[in-house]
């Protein structure tokens, strides 16, 4: 057996062990003056040390909390430090993630004050020749949401996935994904239903596709989406396509966003593999 590291805080040690278990690596803990982490299969040492370095950079990452939940240690007394809500939001998101969240919330408030129609006339996808050169319209449709559930669903996913991408890969990468997916998903949805649509879900589906495929093809990037979550997203997509919810859903934007995210992840991982 090989000792990987020692933690002064047993809660942190357990979080790392739980996460590695979800990656197929079995670690054991031994409690002395500190909590030692031991690896039985020494051939996995390089991989474990690489994961440890990422863990130490941000032990509060949602993936580690999710791993503890998966492994049943949420009620063992090994809980993460509790942070105020807004501090937690800021900690796990970069500036662009927060800026777009604030913009969506502001637009939602304005829509509820002055009415949807006035805001849509100003921000919707170009609806006629007179406004086709209003460049912002090709992107601002993503800022509009039409119910509390709509905006909560999109912003939670945006914070969870967009924040991870921005923290790991930088603001530039998140901005590029957002711009391309908003533009292309909006274009396709416009062809499906006309210009009167809105929501960040096309971008969210792009992030889902990007995070999942990036994690599958380039685990070292630290970007990933659990297979259970991507399965849920696909089932939601299928249910929306067949109108199982009885709601107006931008299916064209969802499918296009997912395709954009997958394509961008494939391109990025192809370049990464060439460099190695």
From Swiss-Prot:
GO molecular function: serine-type endopeptidase activity
Catalyzed reactions per annotation: Cleaves type-1 transmembrane domains using a catalytic dyad composed of serine and histidine that are contributed by different transmembrane domains
Gene Ontology CC terms: plasma membrane
Subcellular location: Cell inner membrane
EC numbers, comma separated: 3.4.21.105
Main location: membrane
Pfam families linked to this entry: Rhomboid, Rhomboid_N
Catalytic machinery residues: 201 (nucleophile), 254
Family annotation (InterPro entries): GlpG_N_sf (IPR038236), Peptidase_S54_GlpG_N (IPR022732), Peptidase_S54_rhomboid_dom (IPR022764), Rhomboid-like_sf (IPR035952), Rhomboid_protease_GlpG (IPR023662)
Membrane topology recorded in Swiss-Prot or TrEMBL: Multi-pass membrane protein
An individual GO BP term: proteolysis
Transmembrane stretches, start-end: 94-114, 142-162, 169-189, 192-212, 229-249, 250-270
UniProtKB keywords: Cell inner membrane, Cell membrane, Hydrolase, Membrane, Protease, Serine protease, Transmembrane, Transmembrane helix
Function of the molecule: Rhomboid-type serine protease that catalyzes intramembrane proteolysis.
Family: Belongs to the peptidase S54 family.
Official protein name in the record: Rhomboid protease GlpG
